Structures are given as structure tokens and as C-alpha cells.
Amino acid sequence: MAKSYSLVPLAFFTMFFVHALAHFPLDSNWYDAHATFYGDMQGDETMQGACGYGDLFQQGYGLETTALSTALFNEGYRCGACFEIKCVNDSQWCLKNVNPIIVTATNFCPPNYSKPDGNWCNPPQKHFDLSMKMFTTIAIYQAGIVPVQYRRVPCIKSGGVRFELRGNPYFLMVLVYNVANAGDVLRVYIKGSNTNWAPMTHNWGQVWHTGINLVGQDLSFWVTTSDRKALEFVSLIPSNWQFGQTYEASRNF
């Protein structure tokens, strides 16, 4: 397992201090929404998706997942966030005496503007399209759609933050995943052993890219999550890295 260290460059010390001051807890209030499901009990249709995670079993997310409507998806920045969801106000379809579920956002539920009044994922509606396994944990399968309440909760992850390298020498893409606590990444900086820190561009989901050629250099990352907490991973990836490889840090948020 690759190691990460907290040797913070002076230029970034101020940034870290500001981020620490801006840290705030996740909102514990419950909010109204609706939920449906897609796929089957094995989760075949829930794999891949608009967050870039690929095989959700391999990446550690399993079937405890959901797609988000436009109002919640935030153009992919919300990928990786965790939600606690409970079925409410429907005695016919809500299962009784069951605990709320906790799911991770791994996909996008697209709007259908040809059905402005009949598509639950159209803005401004807040909607969760759950895996079938998760939906049937809180509601009866035949319901199809149920009213729910949700709130953000910390993500519990095993191991460190993971970085998967994709693309080519002139368009390096990095998937950042297995992020604990807030779960969703707000910004990413990258540094080669022979280059300065540079911001990465949000590509899609939790995939970030840069046009800087960093082949043959050690790679360091500076990651900020949506709660404004920041961590630096110095020389996490050795200079002999290859596209398609995944590297795990020794710590997490």
C-alpha cells in the first residue's frame, strides 16, 4: 500500500488553515423527497453510472447505492456523498419497524422533459432512484414510488482514499473514491515531482483531469471535500505509475 505524509508546503498552509476554519458538520435535519428503484436484486443495472466508479462491488460500494435527481446531483459533485433515507407517510407501502437505510450516491437519475409532470427526476424535485435491494429494505416492492425523508450522514469507509489513473499522457484523468466522512470531493490539486501544484478540472462524476504531462514523475494530491476539509497526499504515487492502476493512501478523511 502506498503511503501519504502530511508535509504541507508553505504555499498551501494558509489554504489548509482557511479550510479548517470553514469546516462545518453535515446537516442533521430531515428533508422531504421521493424514492423509486431501478435494476434487479443483483444490481446489474446499477453498475457503472454517471459518477465514474465503474464496478460498484469492486470499488466497495456494493448495492447500498442510489442515483440522484438533478436537484441533488449538483453536476456530479455530489457523487460519493452518503444519505440516510426512511420511508414516511405511507402506511400502505412503507415497511413498518425497519431502520433507515444508508446509501452512497453513485449515479444520476436524468430528467425527462417530455413528461414534465410525470418524471420524478425532473427539476426541482428531490428524488432518489435506489437500487432494488435498498428500496425493498424500506418499502414494499409493488409500491413503485414512496415518499421519503433524507439527510446527509458521514460516509464510513475502510482503508484510505483511492486514486485510479486513466487517460493518456496529455490528458490524465483521476478517479477519486473511497472517501470517508463527507464523501464528495469539491476540488483536487495535483503535483508532479518536477512540477508545481496545479488545479485539476472537474470532468464528470468524481473524475478529475489535467492536461499536464506527468508521466515519469511521482504524483502528489491535495483533495478538499464538500465540508471544506482538506488532506494532502505527498508522493503517493511513484514515478513508474501506469494508466489503469489504482493507488490507496494510508489515511482518509
Write out the residue ranges for each language-model feature.
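Folded extracytoplasmic luminal domains of secretory or organellar precursors
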Residues: 2-253
